[in-house]
Amino acid sequence: MTAPSQVLKIRRPDDWHVHLRDGDMLKTVVPYTSEIYGRAIVMPNLASPITTVDAAIAYRQRILDAVPAGHDFTPLMTCYLTDSLDADELERGFHEGVFTAAKLYPANATTNSSHGVTSVDAIMPVLERMEKLGMPLLVHGEVTHADVDIFDREARFIDTVMEPLRQRLTALKVVFEHITTKDAAQYVRDGSDNLAATITPQHLMFNRNDMLVGGIRPHLYCLPILKRNIHQQALRDLVASGFTRAFLGTDSAPHSRHRKETRCGCAGCFNAPSALGSYAAVFEEMNALAHFEAFCSLNGPQFYGLPVNTGWVELVRDEQQIPENIALADDSLVPFLAGETVRWSVKK
């Protein structure tokens, strides 16, 4: 990577966790991802979740149809795990190159997760098949028991679900997605080579005070929820150390303005327009720009066993203001950092 004071040039990055939705929303948000990233791991939690090969093929085509001419972008599809999922269907999708990975949502942990897994035991035959195939398991790592405080869900998940699972299936490749706590950072750091993590820009930039002090900021509300600053710092320390099993996963999760700014607002930050520059700002603040390219462009392919992208992306130190709104059919989207000035932006 070359890093003059005003320009950062890196291999074209990938986004290892993104929500592209469907319909008009998909058509609106896809270009923000396809313009910058070579590949993206696409989450399967649509209103009708992606649980079959045919559904994944059809969804992939809808995504590709929304990619503007001139964008070189490959969506990597995932299978939504359910208690009743057919392991043979999953294996077929993996062998045919349709499914890159499978996603474990604990039931009711986040948006459109009501079809999710009620217990790991219920899907153990599927997980055993994945271990045998070398197929990565992507995990939303939170318990959803009513008696567990929302700020403790991730740490409790490690103790009660993640560690027993990994003890039982020691060769299973696992991505602990969008980690938010010092517990998770330490757990991944101490783990074996088949355990990795994605980290979002919002969890590196902000903590729960930013969301709650001086008024509630609904566009910082996501799941897992922002934690206290000691957890934010642990995530920053992890990426600044050059740890190679942590990589870029924006968890960009768009919702229309009226679904965010309401008495019961949805969780998710639409950060695709500004995520790469946000990561750059964090790495710069941490004096860790030497590790920026690896986090964005190298660590993910290494874990997934995929080639590094051949193209390049340049970020320039050019202060720009993030728009307040992005038009969406009969509504609008409020992007992450709306109205704020950012230091780094992708050169067009």
Swiss-Prot record:
Give me the residues that bind Zn(2+) 1, please.
H17, H19, K103, D251
Q: Tell me its family.
A: Belongs to the metallo-dependent hydrolases superfamily. DHOase family. Class II DHOase subfamily.
Q: List its EC numbers.
A: 3.5.2.3
Q: What is this protein called?
A: Dihydroorotase
One Gene Ontology cellular component annotation? cytosol
PROSITE patterns under this entry? DIHYDROOROTASE_1, DIHYDROOROTASE_2
Sites bearing N6-carboxylysine, chain numbering: K103
Query: What's the catalysed reaction?
Result: (S)-dihydroorotate + H2O = N-carbamoyl-L-aspartate + H(+)
For the keyword Chaperone, the answer is no
Name one molecular function that GO assigns to this entry: zinc ion binding
Annotated substrate binding sites: H19, L20, R21, N45, H140, L223, H255, A267
Query: Gene symbol?
Result: pyrC
The entry's function note states: Catalyzes the reversible cyclization of carbamoyl aspartate to dihydroorotate.
- Organism for this UniProt entry: Salmonella paratyphi A (strain AKU_12601)
Annotated catalytic residues = D251
Q: Record-annotated residues binding Zn(2+) 2? A: K103, H140, H178
